[in-house]
């Protein structure tokens, strides 16, 4: 007989549903990814709480509801190719990996990129490629993407990043000042042109250009 999930994980799952996450594929992906593996050992007792937690290099792992909400807004299909800007702990990429064909995730901190890669490999997320790179300067050879997810706040989404969307592609990003509340924005490369919709208020660490010289 399989063991029942711990009470804190059951509450975690229930809270996502109560807060409006209804896409069953997204809920299954969130259930399948062990968030406690993506936080530091001293914070594992907090892993199933719906709150952001600190990780290395002054970054954070987003609260689960925000991860689920952004994932749901991407409207992912199994054949999609996804670009993630800001790997962080690798938690968001692990969720995405269960919903699409391929994930390319860029991280400017080598420490984070290396540790995320190791976690994702341990979970056999073989369709995720972690690269040390600059999210403001995506390599041309990467091509176009069906979906792009930015996990740090941009003051504005660069046109060069929007240009990486394939036709009918969707980009989700927090947009706004770095030291204030931002707005989660959905941008679609529709047949008639670029469509933009503001979704909800969020708070993210800033997206910075370049690759970190240290860490």
UniProtKB/Swiss-Prot annotation:
One of its GO terms (biological process) is protein repair. It catalyses: [protein]-L-isoaspartate + S-adenosyl-L-methionine = [protein]-L-isoaspartate alpha-methyl ester + S-adenosyl-L-homocysteine. It is an enzyme of class 2 (transferase). GO terms for molecular function: protein-L-isoaspartate (D-aspartate) O-methyltransferase activity. Keywords: Cytoplasm, Methyltransferase, S-adenosyl-L-methionine, Transferase. Its EC number is 2.1.1.77. The keyword Methyltransferase applies. GO terms for cellular component: cytoplasm. SUPFAM superfamilies: S-adenosyl-L-methionine-dependent methyltransferases. It is found in: Cytoplasm. The keyword Coiled coil does not apply. InterPro entries: PCMT, SAM-dependent_MTases_sf. The active site is at residue 62. Belongs to the methyltransferase superfamily. L-isoaspartyl/D-aspartyl protein methyltransferase family. Catalyzes the methyl esterification of L-isoaspartyl residues in peptides and proteins that result from spontaneous decomposition of normal L-aspartyl and L-asparaginyl residues. It plays a role in the repair and/or degradation of damaged proteins. PANTHER family: PROTEIN-L-ISOASPARTATE O-METHYLTRANSFERASE (PTHR11579), PROTEIN-L-ISOASPARTATE(D-ASPARTATE) O-METHYLTRANSFERASE (PTHR11579:SF0). This is Protein-L-isoaspartate O-methyltransferase. The lineage of its organism: Bacteria, Pseudomonadati, Pseudomonadota, Alphaproteobacteria, Hyphomicrobiales.
């Amino acid at each position: 007989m399989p063991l029942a999930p711990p009470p804190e994980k059951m509450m975690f799952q229930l809270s996502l549903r109560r807060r409006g996450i209804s896409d069953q594929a997204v809920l299954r992906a969130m259930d399948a990814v062990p968030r406690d593996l993506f936080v530091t050992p001293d914070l594992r007792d907090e892993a199933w709480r719906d709150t952001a937690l600190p990780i290395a290099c002054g970054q954070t792992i987003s609260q689960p509801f925000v991860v689920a909400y952004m994932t749901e807004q991407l409207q992912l299909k199994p054949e999609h190719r996804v670009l993630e800007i800001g790997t962080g702990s690798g938690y968001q990429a692990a969720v995405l990996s269960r919903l699409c064909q391929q994930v390319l995730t860029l991280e400017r901190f080598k420490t984070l990129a290396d540790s995320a890669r190791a976690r994702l490999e341990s979970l056999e997320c073989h369709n995720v490629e972690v690269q040390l790179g600059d999210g403001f300067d995506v390599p041309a050879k990467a091509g176009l993407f069906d979906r792009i997810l930015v996990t740090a706040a941009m003051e504005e989404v660069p046109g060069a990043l929007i240009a990486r969307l394939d036709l009918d592609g969707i980009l989700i990003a927090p947009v706004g000042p770095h030291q204030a509340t931002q707005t989660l924005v959905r941008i679609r490369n529709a047949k008639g042109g670029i469509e933009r919709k503001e979704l909800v208020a969020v708070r993210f660490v800033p997206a910075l250009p370049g690759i970190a010289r240290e860490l």
